[in-house]
Amino acid sequence: MITKDVKEQLIQVSGPENFDDSNAGRLVYSYDATPQYQSMPDAVIAPRNTDEISRILTICSEHRVPIVPRGSGTNLCGGTCPTEGGLVLLFKHMNQILEIDEENLTATVQPGVITLDMIRAVESKGLFYPPDPSSMKISTIGGNINENSGGLRGLKYGVTRDYVIGLEVVLANGDIIRTGGKLAKDVAGYDLTRLFVGSEGTLGIVTEAIVKLVPKPETKKTLLALYENIDAAAQTVSDIIAAKIIPATLEFLDQPTLLVIEDYAKIGLPTSAKAVLLIEQDGPFETVERDMEKIEAICKKGDAVSVQTAQTEEEAFALTEARRSALSALARLKPTTILEDATVPRSEIANMVKAINDIAAKYDISICTFGHAGDGNLHPTCTTDIRNKDEMERVEQAFAEIFEKAIELGGTITGEHGVGEMKAPYLEMKLKKEGIDAMKALKAAFDPRNILNPGKMFAKDARKRVVAER
């Protein structure tokens, strides 16, 4: 609850034009991309700089007002839903690329910068920022940092955490700290930079970031390998890595996903295949040619019924964009789409896909599976209808078993989507009580009044998913 006095203090900081507690204004920021989940904030505020954020947090801390930082709301874990009301903090005024440093190979950016805008800006300088979440046309760098976003290129290049080398962060009490910098080496104290990345706004508010860049790859090449057997496709993934080839992307799609994407994108995908591997390599011309020849041979030896190489950049782009459209394509099928990201060692891909299919059959639900096979990050996606309570109960039970299986195979409940509120009930399955207690101690140290994105990471009831009861 934001009292009249607190409202007046906040408006003094941001100006009345950047504070909104109208019903319409609050409604817009009551939900994110998480299926059928909504919670109203008490107000929305859009500060113009770090100093204003510091003053806002000082006020919120004094009056115990929850505050939820929000980028574009593309997360899939309820991470930016204001579950306990309070204040939603927007970064629409803090959306500048402050510097592209070609000598130190870094970019300094504000959190509201759209991911793809930054990628294009650095590419115009002959540089490359590899993390490429499927939401990059919409998502912000700040959101990527809070979720430690991955993407298709994670196998070769890593994820967001691997590129964030410095941060400006406002703590819960309003203090401003800087971590890291434009440095290749820095072991001064605890690695706070990596701690804040992926913390989902629960430890501090990121107001500026320094990210590492690399030279833009000279060229790239894409191929599509078709399989009549999912096990053969999964084994090919392991065989490629065992051959000491690390592709830029190594994506897996099962037949149900393939059918839906082709109906959506209409680019001539071969829908008769039981599984598809979409593989891209980048780098120097000679290296790409050599690697793709080897990859093609491995695919054929691994019982691929067809291996097709994109003949033009346009064709390669169409294939990659079709893969990125998977969620949009699946979302057309039924009113509710639940996309998860159970992740296993890549040697267990075949076992995990088989388990997902068996679990879907057991509970009589529809699950399409696709994902980043090269790093074991699968996206089992259920199309359903939240109004069908009986089916939703079966969906909940199915995903609980999928997460259990992932952990049994040496994996995790989330590879890149984050925990938020939706996956918090399952976190103890992965970390055990001792791990949760350690995280709670960190949270208490950074945010003793629990005002930073409360209700996220830590579940009130373990293994009771919120989506089933809303």
From Swiss-Prot:
Enzymatic reactions: glycolate + A = glyoxylate + AH2; (R)-lactate + A = pyruvate + AH2
Any one GO CC term of the record: plasma membrane
Pfam families found in the cross-reference section: FAD-oxidase_C, FAD_binding_4
Keyword Flavoprotein part of the UniProt annotation: yes
Keywords: Cell membrane, FAD, Flavoprotein, Membrane, Oxidoreductase
Cofactor needs: FAD
GO molecular function: (S)-2-hydroxy-acid oxidase activity; D-2-hydroxy-acid dehydrogenase activity; FAD binding; glycolate dehydrogenase activity
Function in brief: Component of a complex that catalyzes the oxidation of glycolate to glyoxylate. Is also able to oxidize D-lactate ((R)-lactate). Does not link directly to O(2), and 2,6-dichloroindophenol (DCIP) and phenazine methosulfate (PMS) can act as artificial electron acceptors in vitro, but the physiological molecule that functions as primary electron acceptor during glycolate oxidation is unknown.
Family designation: Belongs to the FAD-binding oxidoreductase/transferase type 4 family.
Subunit structure: The glycolate oxidase likely consists of several subunits including GlcD and GlcF.
Name the record gives this protein: Glycolate oxidase subunit GlcD
Organism: Bacillus subtilis (strain 168)
